[in-house]
Amino acid sequence: MTTKRKAYVREMKANWWTKLDFYRMYMIREATCIATIWFCLVLLYGVISLGGRHIENFISFSQNPLVVILNIISLAGLLYHAATLYVMTPQVLTIVVKNERLNPNILKNALWAITGLVSLLALVLVYI
């Protein structure tokens, strides 16, 4: 049996997420996956070029000003993603030590310290 009532369908515009800062920052954070895809494609191209002895093509590709600009934008996006992740992690992860909740700043600073140490280790390994 069918009903004659009309179902209420709430109108949702395509720019709904631009109204509140929280949603805007969330959508920007989620859009950083594009930067990750770009980085993975460049890395894949570099590995393939290295294996096929076409490293000169990859070096000239990497020196293209457009690629450099895209890499800088990608780095900024990835840093934004990491920064927002490190701010959110203490809010959703509860660590209890001796029946007391760990200070969220300790966890956030520990994440940044680990990131810095891993980055420093990568730089040392590259330039040895």
From Swiss-Prot:
Taxonomic superkingdom: Bacteria
Main location: membrane
Localization per Swiss-Prot or TrEMBL: Cell inner membrane
One of the record's GO cellular component terms: plasma membrane
Membrane spanning residue stretches: 31-51, 67-87, 106-126
UniProt topology in membrane: Multi-pass membrane protein
CDD domains recorded: QFR_TypeD_subunitC
UniProt cross-references to InterPro entries, sorted A to Z: Fumarate_red_C (IPR003510), SQR/QFR_C/D (IPR034804)
Cysteines paired by S-S bonds: none
Gene3D superfamilies: Fumarate reductase/succinate dehydrogenase, transmembrane subunit
Keywords from the named record: Cell inner membrane, Cell membrane, Membrane, Transmembrane, Transmembrane helix
Entries under SUPFAM superfamilies matching the protein: Fumarate reductase respiratory complex transmembrane subunits (SSF81343)
Function: Anchors the catalytic components of the fumarate reductase complex to the cell membrane, binds quinones.
Entries under HAMAP family matching the protein: Fumarate_red_C
Family statement: Belongs to the FrdC family.
Assembly and binders: Part of an enzyme complex containing four subunits: a flavoprotein (FrdA), an iron-sulfur protein (FrdB), and two hydrophobic anchor proteins (FrdC and FrdD).
Protein name, entry field: Fumarate reductase subunit C
